[in-house]
Structures are given as C-alpha cells and as structure tokens.
Swiss-Prot record:
Residues 165-177 have a biased composition (Basic and acidic residues). The gene is Znf507. This is Zinc finger protein 507. GO terms for cellular component: nucleus. A zinc finger (C2H2-type) spans 122-144, 152-175, 237-259, 630-652, 658-680, 686-709, 746-768, 774-796, 899-921. It is found in: Nucleus.
C-alpha cells in the first residue's frame, strides 16, 4: 500500500496492553515485511491492498491501517514497533499542511516513549482526521471553513473544554489510574449545549480484547465491497469502477446506470448520508463483536459539511445482565445527547449500513429496490442496523426519553415484524423494543433471520397512535413508486406468485362491496396483487408483515381494530395511486365541460349518508365537516364527489390474468392480449378512396388527391360507393356494389350523408329536423366544432366502451361529408353533419369546415351508453349530433365554442354560467339519465 499522510488514533496505555494504531507510512521495516508476508497468506487482504493502490491517486481515500498488539513496551523502546494484528478502516486525507503533519508525526513518534508510555491524539469530528499535534488539527479545521473556536472533548468521559492544557490535565488526573479495557457506556453528556456552532475534537477509539484474524479479514472484505463510489474530502464523488468524478449527487445517480450490470453496484441513496454518518458506518462495520469502539459524529446546521444533526453511537461488548449498563438506562431513559448502547454477541460481526446497501454484492438496481419492499433480514448470524433520517430530523426538537429493553434472551434475535415501538405513556416517554432505537429523529433498527414461530404471533401494541418503527425515506419512496408503476403495468396479477398456504385469514372479504369492483376471490389475495397494505377498521384479523423472501404473515391480535397511520404509509403503491387520482381529478376539474352530468347525477340522486352500498362497505368513510368528505380507507385518497370516489375504488380491484388495463378486456393468453393492445396503440391510416394508397397524415392524402386525382384542395374525396336513397330513415340497408364484403351502407334521404350503421344515420337525420350541437354521449360535452369534439374524446380513451380509432374515423367522416355538401351546394346553406355512431368507415379524409352553433338536444332523444351498445355490435358508446346553419359566404370557416343546456337550449360562452343554469334542471337531468325504458322500444324498432 502507498504511504498515507494521515495518522490513526493513538490512545493512552494504562494498566493493560492496548493496540496502538498508526498510519502505514510510519511503520517500521519489520512491520512492513510482516504485513506483506501476511497479505500473501490471506488473499482477502491482498485484494484489498490492490484496490487501495488503484484508488490511492486521488486526494482522499479510505485505507486500511494495519498494526500489531504486543506486551507493553519499555520506556526506551519505540512504541511504533509494538503494534498488534488489528485492522480498522480510517479516512486518509491530504491537505496543504501535509508536510507540517509529517513533521509533527515524526516528532510525535519520537516522544511516544515519554510521559510514562502515554500518548494523545486529536481527531476532527467532521472528517475523522487524526493528528498528534493540536496545532496541526487547528490548521486542518480551517480547511472545513470553520472560523469558530475549537472545542475539545475527552473520548473517555466526554468532558469538554476550550483549553488544550485543561483537557490534557483532565486526562492525566482523571484517567491515569482507570482501566481502559471497556468503553464507558453512560457518558456524562456535559457540554451538550456547547456543541452548537462549534467544532468538536475527540479521542474516540479504544481497542480492548483481541480477535481472530479471520473475523478481521471478513470485516475488511465487507467494507471493501460495500460502496462502489467514494466521497472525497473536498466535495467530489468518485466512481471506483471507472474513476468518474462529479460534484453533485444527481450526476452520480445518473452515472450509476452505466454500471447497472455490476453486482457490486446499487442505486446510490444520499437521504441519510453525511460524512460523519458515513464514517460512522464504515468504522462500526469493521469493529468485531468484542471491540469497544466509541464513534462520535458531532456537527450542526452551521458547521457540519452536510448540515446533519449531532449523532452519538456507542457499541460495547457483551456483559452479563447483572453488570450490563443497559439496566441503568432502562431506569432513567437515554437522552439525545448521550450515547445509545447496543448489546451484541462477540461471535457476531456488527454491520451498519444504509437500507440500499444490504446484500450489495448480490443485488442489482431492481433487486435492491425489492429489498426495500420486503425488508428481508440479512444472512444468518449478522445483525443489520438500518440507519435512516426522518424528515423531522432537521427540526429542533426537545429531547425525548427512550427506554431500551435489555432482557434479550440468548439465541433469540428480534424479528422484523416486531420492529415497532409501543407507547407506554401520554408524555414523551416511549418504550422501544430490541429492534429500534430513536436518537433525535434518527432511527436505528436491526433484524435477524432467527426467530421462533411462537414469537411471530405476538401482536403489536394495541394503541393505534404508536409511533412507527420504520419509515421510508423520500428517496426510497420514489424508487418504490417507480417499481410499483412498473409492476402495475407489466404484471397483470401479483397474487398468483404467492402460495395460499402462506397467507393467513384476511378479515372478511365480503366487507368489500361489489360496486367497488373487488372480485370475490377464494383466498385473501385481495389487495396484495398490488402490494397494498389495506387495513379495515372492523376486521379482527389483519396482515401486519409481508416478507417476500419467506412469505411470512403475522396475524394481528383479536383486539386489534385498525393499523396505525405509520403502517399504512409503508405500502409501496398508496402514495403513487393517490398522486394519480389527484392528477386525474385535477384534470377533470380543468376540463371545459367534462363530467358535468355525472356530477349532477351523483350529487342530486343521493344524500351523503343514503348510499348504504358505498358507505356501509367499510371501504369509504364519510366525514361530514371535512372539505373532502369521502375518504378511501384502503389508501389516503379523498374527494368531495361520490362519483370520483367510486371511480377511484377501481384501482383496488384485483385484475384477472391477461386483462387489458385500459378497457378491462380479458384475453385468453398473452398473444391475444398483445393483439388486443394494438387496437389501443396503433396509428391512424388515411385511405385514399380513389385508389389503394394509404397515408399516415391528412396532408399527404390531400397532396396525393390533388396531384394524382386532380381534386380541388378545398374538397375532400367523395365516396364512390353506390348509395340507396332514403333507406336510412326507414331502417333499410343495401349491399355495397363495388366491394366484395358484406358491409351494409346507410344513407340519409335528405343529403348524401352515408354511414355503416343505422344509428349513425338516424342521429344525422336530426340535423334536418332540429338544431342540435355536437355532443359527447359519455359525459355531455357539447361543441359546434367537430375537431374540438375529436380533441375532447381523448379524455375517454380509457373507457371500456370506447374505441378512439373508430370514433375518430366517424368524426373525420362527418367533416368529410360536410365538405362534400359544401362542394355541391356552392352558396346554398351548408349542412354540417354530425359524427356518426362508432363503427368502421370506408375512409376518413377530412377538410376543416365547421360553422354550426350550439343548441340543445331534446330530453326524449337522449340515449345512454347501454342503449347504443345494444344497437351497435361494435360495443362503442359515443354519439354526437349536429345541426345546420348558414354561412356568410361559401367556404368561410367559422368556429365558436358555446356551452349549451341539454334541456332548454340555454347557451353561454361561460362554463360557470351554464353550471349555474343547469342547477335548475337537476331533477330532469337525473330522470333522463336514469330512465332506460325507452331502450326496449328502440331495440324493437
């Protein structure tokens, strides 16, 4: 390894032999030879050394410091030659004062033998830089941009002082006769108020009991392969695969996709990451179970590089319960300004990592996101400490007292299903179990795969206001939402992957009303097809934990009525679905006339508490005085309109295999579904009626007609099929004379309008009888401009009874018929035909000529979607009627958008005025829409 300019921690040697750590650059030749011989024997060490050489050319890298532990040296011997086999990662830094530090290091190495074998070292709390000289450290602190006075803190008792002499005198007087084999688990915490706006310097490492070389090598290997990028001292991120450097986190996230195939590369998450916390993770991960390490990361919003709050974590070796310091903390609670002690077995290697870095060597970008969903435990024998910062961590909060349960039985580890904290008092006093510890907005939880089945059935705290033990960060939520969106599109049914035997009883399936679209499946697979945690208030049993690795389901206790809000938020799809619904509702509100009749029907037909099928199903909750009174209990969606909330409940419905997500068509197999989806996605083709040429754009078709067929530019191509007059009004039909197909052709008896359906000609016939606007039968939207109706129909693209392609052809055909009438009349009143009912047409060339105005349609002539579906075998439901008007001059284009009342013909250019007017007709509108008696008579005709 190359020589490093930093020096590791040097601690006092009192009583018993201790490990003295130093940089490899100052190791004696005998130590280097011994190290090289040991590296050859251990391939893991050899690999890590090579990796260190690769990344050693940058300004600041993490390096491995190797030392030895031997009996206490004599006062005349050089203590640097008496190092034991102990390996810890440390942060190596270079600065303009590197030469000064090297001089100080040489001076310190020559004076280590003095002062009765005791040595002191000063450490920067921002980057963990170590120096035996206080002057060098002060110069180093200035590199962080800190101009405040340096605050010194003792690593043994955390006593603080502004004077170097006072602190040195304190160390000599207070700790010269005390044993240093164990770190103190209950620091005094004094000077906590002085941490603000000042930089702390501490002496934090104290190595005690020896460990085997195998455990140390495993720790080195784990730390070496954990991160594929490094954070430089001067604010630069560096990729360890290709040496790419950048200064922003978003650039590193973009660069991560270039290494998506690497097993050691996962999507970086910086939600919890600041430099002190990152060094905390790397330092604690390499500490074996019997090593006492106190790592203190101190900083605040003014001084810390990443503006993170102060965090203190202390890990102590295992002690008998009678002598464990945890018992004292259970009596008084642990303050935020004190160190939190975690108890672990000596055989276990402690690992502290962020959630995205679990099992990093075996995960890809997608599988790491799956890990966040499942929260699966790590390998057996390891303790995963998941550290994440809550959104409230940036706020200044009063200290909270937490009780840590120290009664951990041997051979048992906490289950991830129990990673919840229960409320034991009305104040700020909580009880945290063995899985979670809260440190001022910082949650540290750990899990293990070892858990008895009897413990899995233990219920959570019955209080629904219990604080959650695990909250996902914003970065995790965004990744999970992306994964959920992908799952909803690519996986028609998720529940098929689960075994019914692995799922417990999930409440009462009949609690879901059929109106919500919830299918009555034979198993409790209702909402897990989308991985949505769906608590019902009246259910006695519920699913509280779902682990993808072993499909473990833990049942709630019988007295449990409702899951807490924190648990509801852990569902991966709920926030995504809520956003989608709110965007959809906002789009509907901004529409010109969309869904007016539907809103009037919903609001006029039923009172808030009269819908027993909706509110009585325990799925929709009605809050009388709220701005959005209707709230879905399966997620966080709320609305002020019953129609929206009923439409929203579709998202909780379980889809069948091979079901179309747009029109809910159920295919037989994947190929059938693929061919069906083409109908929703294929582009429109414009067919020339004079020849067999087809074009993708209307302009190409018009150019072709003008050049090849010598047709005027203002006219569209007239259809050359033979037509039989007056058969449309009488319901008669005839075969096309020049086509071998059996397609029927209907024709208007007044003009030359033709259609392939009787309904289309019948609706067109109203043009000659009364004044009618172009109207959408799905929502009541009216307009006088056919292209405006075409644009409007995009809003119904996801309707199950709507085919945009066929409706678009019908609109184009209506425009084309208008153009033909204009060409034949030449000064006569122009008849603007309406859009026909859906169905295949012979062609769709169009010329934009529209001059109609808006009036109303008579109540008796309103048709609903079910009637049209019966009359037309295509199953599409959209009819638009039009009316005629005169033009000021032939060929003049005139377009006006009016909002028309469908009852009395009231017209207004303002949507608000129409809404105010239509309140007078609410009863009539509801009766018209709900009246379906006339459909039988129409079918008979």
């Amino acid at each position: 390894m190359e020589e490093s300019s930093s020096i590791a921690m040097l601690v006092q040697e009192i009583g018993e032999p201790e490990a003295v750590l130093t940089a490899e650059g100052v190791l004696s030749p005998s130590s280097e030879v011994d190290q090289q011989r040991k590296a050859k024997a251990d391939p893991l060490v050899h690999v890590i050394q090579k990796l260190s050489k690769i990344v050693g050319h940058e300004k600041s890298q993490k390096c491995l410091l190797i030392g030895k532990k031997r009996p206490r040296p004599s006062e005349t011997a050089n203590s640097l030659e008496k190092l034991e086999n102990c390996e810890i990662p440390a942060k190596a830094t270079e600065s303009p004062a590197a030469g000064v530090r090297k001089t100080e290091m040489s001076q310190a190495s020559s004076t280590l033998a003095s002062n009765d074998g005791k040595a002191m070292s000063y450490q920067c709390s921002l980057c963990k830089f170590l120096s035996p000289s206080f002057s060098v450290l002060k110069e180093h602190v200035k590199q962080h941009g800190q101009q405040h006075d340096v605050m010194l803190m003792c690593s043994e008792c955390h006593a603080t002082s502004r004077s170097q002499q006072e602190l040195e005198a304190h160390v000599v007087s207070e700790h010269e006769n005390s044993a240093s084999s164990q770190a103190r688990s209950s620091p005094s915490g004094q000077g906590a108020t002085e941490r603000k706006s000042e930089t702390m310097v501490d002496i934090p490492v104290n190595m005690g009991s020896p460990q085997t070389h195998a455990v140390q090598s495993a720790a080195m290997a784990e730390s070496g392969r954990r991160k594929w990028y490094a954070y430089e001292q001067y604010g630069m991120y560096r990729c360890l695969f290709c040496s790419y450097t950048c200064g922003q986190q978003r650039m590193l996230k973009t660069h991560a996709w270039k290494h998506a195939g690497e097993v050691n590369c996962s999507y970086p998450i910086f939600e919890n990451e600041n430099e002190p916390l990152g060094l905390l993770a790397s330092s604690m991960s390499a500490a074996p179970g019997g090593v006492d390490a106190v790592v203190i990361a101190i900083g605040d919003s003014e001084l810390s590089i990443h503006n993170g709050p102060s965090v203190q974590v202390q890990i102590c070796s295992s002690d008998p319960p009678s002598s464990s310091p945890l018992e004292q903390s259970t009596e008084e609670g642990v303050h935020l300004n004190q160190a939190v002690t975690l108890d672990a077995n000596e055989e276990e290697m402690l690992e502290v990592m962020s959630d995205s870095e679990e099992n990093l060597f075996a995960d890809s970008l997608l599988s790491s996101a799956q890990k966040i969903i499942s929260s699966s435990p790590n390998k057996k024998g390891h303790v995963n400490v998941i550290v994440e910062r809550l959104p409230s961590a940036e706020e200044t909060l009063p200290p909270k007292h937490f009780l840590i349960n120290a009664e951990m039985e041997e051979g048992k580890s906490p289950s991830p299903s129990e990673a919840q904290t229960g409320c034991v008092g009305a104040g700020n006093m909580y009880h945290a179990d063995k899985c979670t510890v809260d440190i001022g907005g910082l949650i540290i939880g750990w899990s293990s795969a070892e858990k008895k089945d009897s413990e899995l059935s233990k219920g959570l705290a019955p209080d629904e206001n219990a604080p959650p033990g695990r909250r996902r960060t914003n970065s995790e939520s965004l990744r999970l939402h992306s994964l959920a969106a992908e799952a909803l599109v690519t996986m028609p049914i998720r529940a098929a992957e689960l075994t019914r035997a692995s799922l417990g009883h999930y409440g009462d399936i009949n609690l879901l009303d059929p109106d919500t679209g919830q299918r009555q499946v034979s198993g409790p697979l209702a909402t897990y097809s989308k991985k949505i945690m769906s608590p019902l208030k009246n259910s006695t049993d519920g699913v509280t934990s779902f682990n993808q690795s072993n499909s473990t389901v833990v049942a709630l206790p019988e007295g449990r009525q409702e899951l807490s809000d924190g648990q509801v938020k852990t569902g991966i799809s709920m926030s995504l679905l809520t956003v989608i619904e709110k965007l959809r509702e906002r789009t509907d509100q901004n529409a010109s006339d969309d869904d007016i009749l539907k809103e009037l029907q919903d609001n006029a037909q039923c009172q808030p508490n009269s819908d027993g099928s909706l509110l009585g199903s325990n799925v929709v909750e009605y809050i009388p005085d709220a701005e959005r009174p209707y709230r879905c209990r399966l997620c966080n969606y709320s609305s002020g309109n019953r129609g929206y909330i009923k439409q929203h409940l579709r998202v909780h419905r379980q889809r069948q295999p091979y079901q179309c997500p747009i029109c809910e068509h159920i295919a037989e197999n994947s190929k059938d579904l693929e061919s069906h989806m083409i109908n929703h996605c294929k582009t429109r083709i414009h067919q020339c009626k004079q020849c067999k040429e087809s074009f993708h754009y209307k302009s190409q078709l018009r150019n072709h007609e003008r050049e090849q067929h010598c047709l005027p530019n203002t006219l569209s191509v007239a259809s050359n099929e033979p037509r039989i007059s007056r058969d449309a009004a009488d319901g008669k039909c005839a075969q096309e004379g020049n086509k071998p197909s059996t397609q029927k052709q209907y024709r208007c008896d007044v003009c030359d309008y033709t259609s392939t359906t009787y309904v289309g000609v019948r609706n067109h016939r109203r043009v000659h009888n009364s004044d009618k606007p172009y109207r959408c039968s799905l929502c009541g939207y009216v307009c006088s401009h056919p292209p405006s109706l075409k644009s409007h129909m995009w809003k119904h693209a996801s309707d199950q009874n709507y085919n945009y392609e066929q409706v678009n052809k019908a609109i184009n055909d209506a425009i084309s018929q208008s153009a033909r009438v204009l060409g034949k009349s030449r000064g006569k009143p122009l008849l603007t035909s309406s859009e026909e009912r859906t169905g295949p047409t012979t062609g769709s060339p169009e010329n934009l000529v529209s001059s109609s105005e808006l009036t109303s349609q008579l109540p008796g002539e309103v048709m609903d979607a079910s009637e049209l579906e019966k009359l037309n075998p295509t199953g599409c439901s959209s009819d638009v009627s039009g009316r005629s008007c005169s033009l000021a001059a032939p060929g003049t284009e005139y377009c006006v958008l009016l909002f028309c009342c469908c009852i009395c013909g009231f017209e207004s250019t303002s949507k608000e005025s129409l809404l105010d007017h239509m309140k007078e007709h609410e009863g009539e509108i509801v009766s018209i829409i709900l009246n379906k008696d006339h459909s039988t008579a129409l079918n008979a005709n």
